[in-house]
């Protein structure tokens, strides 16, 4: 695609998946192109997407394992071929797929002799295993073997200090990085002032999500990162009138909690879960990540608390309040604050 002029192209950017394949259960590959881009834009987009794909995509993994009567992680257990450390390393490699937030419990409880694989993990309903054949341990004798596990959804690489826990549990260095690798290349075409660039993007994932899903999530995260600048202008922020500092419009949920209690003392706020409020999936996930599970949790937060939540946007707060006004059987309009 060729632009008529460099400074003001009327052509719309288009992207396309040109190749997609599954090399194994834990290795997906996708190749995408984006064009036409002006000179330098492909590098800007490529760098931003690569960083977002490798560092901002959330993944689910096992973060802790608890053994019974094991003095330290370098111990061996009678009747098991692998040491405790080797079992922990095998658990670290297990690839999980889920949309859960917070910590969940799982377990393994089997009787030998037999091989233990990922298929033997007893998981909560919201979690599934990508490759059930992943090895964990080999029981060589007829023994009962049980492990309690903790599962968490996070992003990036999380490490914990190694120490002996009295309850027999050991932390696992969690690698919550579903995207295994990202490459990008740039192809220039056209002549003279009609030159433009094509961005080629290659993505490899661990099978917990497809490269296309990873690209969508990374793009969404980048958009959310820049939205505050757009909303500042939309809300009429005047930097000339506020030369010294910027004060966001007042929005304190604590005041509304007081009003709520005044108008409807009988409402059990701690029994109303945010799942019942018909929030968008994006807003719901933001709140769950911040351990906000009930209406009481939500209404106890200030605007500053909410805006500190990762990926929480200005428009999310308005959506939350609009939803409360629509569905709660009380008159909250009296103390409603303007946006």
UniProtKB/Swiss-Prot annotation:
Domain of life from the UniProt record: Eukaryota
Catalyses which reaction(s): RNA(n) + a ribonucleoside 5'-triphosphate = RNA(n+1) + diphosphate
Top-rank EC class of the record's enzyme: transferase
SUPFAM superfamilies cross-referenced by the UniProt entry: C-terminal domain of RNA polymerase alpha subunit, Insert subdomain of RNA polymerase alpha subunit, RBP11-like subunits of RNA polymerase
Keywords of this entry: Chloroplast, DNA-directed RNA polymerase, Nucleotidyltransferase, Plastid, Transcription, Transferase
Enzyme Commission number(s) of this protein: 2.7.7.6
Localization in the cell: Plastid, Chloroplast
Molecular function terms from GO: DNA binding; DNA-directed RNA polymerase activity; protein dimerization activity
GO biological process, one term: DNA-templated transcription
Assembly information from the UniProt record: In plastids the minimal PEP RNA polymerase catalytic core is composed of four subunits: alpha, beta, beta', and beta''. When a (nuclear-encoded) sigma factor is associated with the core the holoenzyme is formed, which can initiate transcription.
NCBIfam families from the UniProt entry: rpoA
Domain notes: The N-terminal domain is essential for RNAP assembly and basal transcription, whereas the C-terminal domain is involved in interaction with transcriptional regulators and with upstream promoter elements.
Name the UniProt record assigns to this protein: DNA-directed RNA polymerase subunit alpha
Organism field: Thinopyrum elongatum
